[in-house]
């Protein structure tokens, strides 16, 4: 793609070469602008999930293109194997994997992080001498997201709403306890309880028929 004539501009400001100081500052700024990456926005091209339920990596193409001296945008290459973060501490996690087409915010690390892989908990030497390189970025979140269709909404009025159109499964190896200060309501066309024994305390009110063998 190419910028319009109105948007084209030189990289050197007026007066950059007016003094030795200005020329030096221009050279320093050029190094910072071209070699030091901080945070940037990209689009996910592909995702490789981690083994088991661990997080994985994604290939991401930057959405802001570099430009040449004529103001023309340059083709941007996909940056491979960027690790993505998730909400997790210890063994507790909220698992949501990125998908191709997601627009994500990435942060470039100071050093080469290629030696810091899954399971690494001790400091490692940098994988190379590169600094602030986009190849050493970490995906920290999504931006300009789509309208979600499955979600958990936590509101400031102390309520939680869960929407899962395709199904909802709660699995545990221990007991499940529901505590409510009011009525617990279950609305469904059919409710099945698969248990060898059902125990109830208190009164049982039934509107309708009770069938059994």
How should these model regions be labeled?
Residues 154, 160-163, 168-172, 176-178, ...:
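Low-complexity, small-hydrophobic/phenylalanine-enriched stretches
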Residues 2-180:
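Hydrophobic packing positions characteristic
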């Amino acid at each position: 793609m190419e910028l319009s004539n109105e948007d084209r501009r030189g990289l050197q400001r007026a007066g950059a070469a007016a003094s030795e100081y200005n020329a030096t500052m221009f050279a320093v700024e050029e190094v910072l602008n071209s070699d030091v990456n901080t945070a940037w926005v990209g689009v996910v091209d592909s995702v490789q999930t981690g083994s088991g339920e661990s997080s994985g990596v994604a290939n991401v193409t930057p959405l802001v293109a570099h430009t040449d001296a004529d103001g023309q945008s340059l083709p941007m290459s996909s940056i491979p194997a960027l690790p993505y973060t998730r909400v997790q501490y210890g063994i507790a996690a909220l698992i949501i994997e990125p998908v191709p087409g997601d627009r994500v915010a990435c942060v470039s690390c100071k050093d080469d992080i290629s030696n810091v892989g899954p399971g690494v908990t001790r400091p490692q030497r940098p994988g190379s001498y590169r600094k602030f390189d986009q190849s050493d970025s970490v995906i920290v979140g999504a931006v300009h997201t789509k309208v979600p269709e499955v979600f958990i909404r936590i509101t400031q009025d102390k309520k939680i709403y869960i929407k899962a159109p395709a199904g909802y499964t709660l699995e545990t190896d221990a007991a499940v306890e529901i505590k409510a200060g009011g009525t617990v309501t279950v609305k469904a066309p059919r409710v099945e309880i698969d248990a060898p024994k059902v125990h109830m305390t208190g009164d049982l009110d039934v509107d309708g028929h009770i069938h059994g063998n």
